[in-house]
Amino acid sequence: MVQSCSAYGCKNRYDKDKPISFHKFPLKRPLLCRKWEAAVRRADFKPTKYSSICSDHFTADCFKRECNNKLLKDNAVPTIFAHTEIKKKSGKAVKKEQLPAEPEPVPSVPEVDPAIGLLLPPLYTPSHIAVICDHNYTVEDTVHQRRRIQQLEEQVDKLRKKLKIANQKCRRQERSLEKLEREVSEYREAKGSGYVIFPGNYYEVLNENEYKELAPEITYKEIIL
């Protein structure tokens, strides 16, 4: 189904070669949707999930700048509507299509809520509609999504690099730990054997176990070199 503009007299239809975007009625936001309906000014018009307004009916400040005028800001309301000129088939005078006359404003009477006994806030009419453009609420293309995906992919790459560096550090620490364990083991093995050097003309070097066999009454630690 080809998208077309629901504005009165607008003949814009979706064309990928034209810089015109289409924005669906905010049906999930009743208050804002009623503002759109009032701005369109079409009698007995009820928007559906397929109804949309083209970007020609929104002012420039209603769009997010970084999205090339394809993303509306929050609470944006269409305000640009021109009278449609219809030419007669006979080629005579061109008449302007008259829009339905607006009803006379009815003075609002404050209402009292019987439950709490307080005045209710006044109802706002189309004349009170104000264009408030703050945040995006609709997405007509995938520019924002693609940009977000690209950012996430960059973050994943950075985390992978950090993980690789951390793994390399862990492997180096494991090798250092294994080296220290070998040194400690070798030191303990070497510490189990001792040597005694006798003074004077005795230059024989005896193993501790051999010395104990020769002089069992003297301990190895009592020998003064």
Swiss-Prot record:
Residues 139-194 form a coiled coil. The keyword Metal-binding applies. SMART domains: DM3 (SM00692), THAP (SM00980). It comes from the Eukaryota. The keyword Hydrolase does not apply. A zinc finger (THAP-type) spans 5-57. One of its GO terms (cellular component) is nucleoplasm. Gene3D superfamilies: THAP domain. One of its GO terms (molecular function) is sequence-specific DNA binding. It is found in: Nucleus, Nucleoplasm. Keywords: Cell cycle, Coiled coil, DNA-binding, Metal-binding, Nucleus, Transcription, Transcription regulation, Zinc, Zinc-finger. DNA-binding transcription regulator that regulates endothelial cell proliferation and G1/S cell-cycle progression. Specifically binds the 5'-[AT]NTNN[GT]GGCA[AGT]-3' core DNA sequence and acts by modulating expression of pRB-E2F cell-cycle target genes. PANTHER family: THAP DOMAIN-CONTAINING (PTHR46600), THAP DOMAIN-CONTAINING PROTEIN 1 (PTHR46600:SF1). Belongs to the THAP1 family. This is THAP domain-containing protein 1. The lineage of its organism: Eukaryota, Metazoa, Chordata, Craniata, Vertebrata. The gene is thap1.
